Amino acid sequence: MRPSLSDYQHVASGKVRELYRVDDEHLLFVATDRISAFDFVLDTPIPDKGRILTAMSVFFFGLLTVPNHLAGPPDDPRIPEEVLGRALLVRRLDMLPVECVARGYLTGSGLLDYQRTGAVCGHVLPQGLGEASRLDPPLFTPATKADIGEHDMNVDFAAVVGLVGAVRANQLRDETIKIYTRAAAHALHKGIILADTKFEFGVDIEGNLVLADEVFTPDSSRYWDAAHYQPGVVQDSFDKQFVRNWLTGPESGWDRASDTPPPPLPDEVAVATRERYIEAYERISGLSFSDWIGPSA
């Protein structure tokens, strides 16, 4: 269910977000409480999730010294009260058709690719790596953007060059690794491993590359507790991997290979996911989520 905002025209729906036109130069970027996994949007919302994602993005946009799409503070008067705390006023950009993924550790689809081919997105890796093996230096492992209900596809660097040209592809790779490295160092200082993350970039009217969408949220990143990190096993996480693990476990009764929609989440899984998202935000930012603006779920 999307917010009905009478003052603004709805222009697009994503898996988790809704986009509204503010004027010719600005959009309203609204994070809902929907959650997606394995490229499906689940039936069960996670209470306050949209506010947590927005709070985390605002924190990291402030921490990072790179151009981004924000066009005002999270309490900008142009943001309607009913979406306060889960919406951002952003600049219109020409978005690039690439998911820019940085991997500092081997897990998820990267691990599956490695187990099948010995490589990840064209990066040939040493033998003997396993779940949660550290990758030094971090890898740029891009993917194509998928529509709702379709699957993102990992691609190699040559495919990115084919999509956006060599100059822009090199820029995307370099910026992705630079931004990830900065954020990973910050998270580790707070006792959390930033295992991987994904970005989206756009281009402004002057041709400048701009960081857009969400950044370093528990939706777009994998966060692990550094104190309990152990290579070779699935890590306890502060992100939606918790939901993925339940869906692929015996309790859900769901067969991922069937390509049928996943079942609803039990209340206890939704509540635990909310708690993990909040813990990630509070530990990394040093702020209390109870102080974040907007109505709580």
From Swiss-Prot:
Pfam families: SAICAR_synt. Its EC number is 6.3.2.6. This is Phosphoribosylaminoimidazole-succinocarboxamide synthase. GO terms for cellular component: cytoplasm. It catalyses: 5-amino-1-(5-phospho-D-ribosyl)imidazole-4-carboxylate + L-aspartate + ATP = (2S)-2-[5-amino-1-(5-phospho-beta-D-ribosyl)imidazole-4-carboxamido]succinate + ADP + phosphate + 2 H(+). Pathway: Purine metabolism; IMP biosynthesis via de novo pathway; 5-amino-1-(5-phospho-D-ribosyl)imidazole-4-carboxamide from 5-amino-1-(5-phospho-D-ribosyl)imidazole-4-carboxylate: step 1/2. InterPro entries: SAICAR_synt/ADE2_N, SAICAR_synth, SAICAR_synthetase_CS. One of its GO terms (biological process) is 'de novo' IMP biosynthetic process. It comes from Mycobacteroides abscessus (strain ATCC 19977 / DSM 44196 / CCUG 20993 / CIP 104536 / JCM 13569 / NCTC 13031 / TMC 1543 / L948) (Mycobacterium abscessus). Belongs to the SAICAR synthetase family. One of its GO terms (molecular function) is phosphoribosylaminoimidazolesuccinocarboxamide synthase activity. Keywords: ATP-binding, Ligase, Nucleotide-binding, Purine biosynthesis.
